[in-house]
């Protein structure tokens, strides 16, 4: 199995800045989830978690006055989740290459080996997540988790918090990272995700915004193919990319394909 990652030409060149041969690494930025995913998508995932809290309380006949369904999921005046000061950083991946990007800048599609990505996650404490689109299984999953987690978080008019052994913050993260609206099922999206403290990440200026990101280094053998989109518009680029990959000690003829 392979997964596809779309990158700009500039991002591709930057990712191989320190690459030197087939036994080395290339680096892609995992950007802050809140900065690259539409707000309504985040809110949809969290709304299903909130709905599952209500379903659990109905099942357990918890009085309305003791309900935790109205618990705030974000810090006040912030897009950061309540709980630890940890952010979610992702590289979007897809089961299919998708349509060419509508951009003035050339883009490439990287074909990445699923098994190699899985091994990377095991060794580096990343997560490779398959997005979920069906509402009922998501609600059932969250509600089942609440059997263990409901008593590990608290909420009243003055305080919101977690017990030391709580995994409710992980549920909040999963609602943001994994859940997508049913209408997006055709995306077949995966996410290579990293959770990092906000004071341990890097920042870059991009398209008028300040974007937090985490550099994720992958072994070169994780990369199976590089697809150049709409190459006929820029006939010089294919040969130049060929030379670029060779300059990094990589098998250009094996990696580079016309799309």
Residue ranges and their predicted role:
Residues 1-259:
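NAD-dependent ADP-ribosyltransferases
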């Amino acid at each position: 199995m392979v997964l596809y990652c779309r990158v700009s030409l500039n991002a591709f060149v930057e990712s191989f800045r320190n690459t030197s041969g087939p036994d080395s690494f290339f680096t892609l930025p995992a950007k802050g989830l809140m900065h690259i995913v539409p707000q309504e998508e985040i809110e949809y995932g969290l709304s299903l978690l909130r709905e599952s809290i209500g379903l659990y309380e109905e099942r357990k006949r918890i009085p309305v006055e003791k309900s935790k369904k109205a618990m705030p999921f974000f810090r006040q005046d912030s897009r950061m989740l309540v709980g630890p000061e940890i952010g979610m950083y992702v590289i979007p991946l897809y089961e299919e290459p998708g349509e060419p990007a509508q951009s003035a800048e050339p883009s490439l599609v990287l074909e990445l080996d699923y098994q190699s990505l899985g091994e990377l996650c095991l060794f580096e404490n990343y997560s490779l997540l398959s997005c979920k689109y069906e509402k009922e299984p998501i609600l059932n999953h969250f509600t089942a988790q609440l059997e263990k987690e409901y008593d590990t978080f608290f909420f009243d008019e003055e305080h919101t918090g977690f017990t030391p052994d709580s995994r409710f913050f992980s549920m909040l993260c999963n609602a943001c990272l994994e859940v997508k609206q049913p209408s997006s099922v055709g995306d077949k999206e995966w996410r290579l995700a990293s959770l990092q403290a906000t004071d341990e990440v890097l920042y870059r200026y991009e398209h008028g915004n300040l974007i937090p990101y985490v550099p994720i280094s992958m072994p070169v053998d994780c990369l199976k193919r590089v697809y150049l989109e709409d190459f006929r518009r820029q006939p010089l680029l294919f040969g130049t990319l060929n030379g670029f990959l060779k300059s990094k000690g990589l098998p250009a003829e094996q990696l580079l394909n016309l799309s």
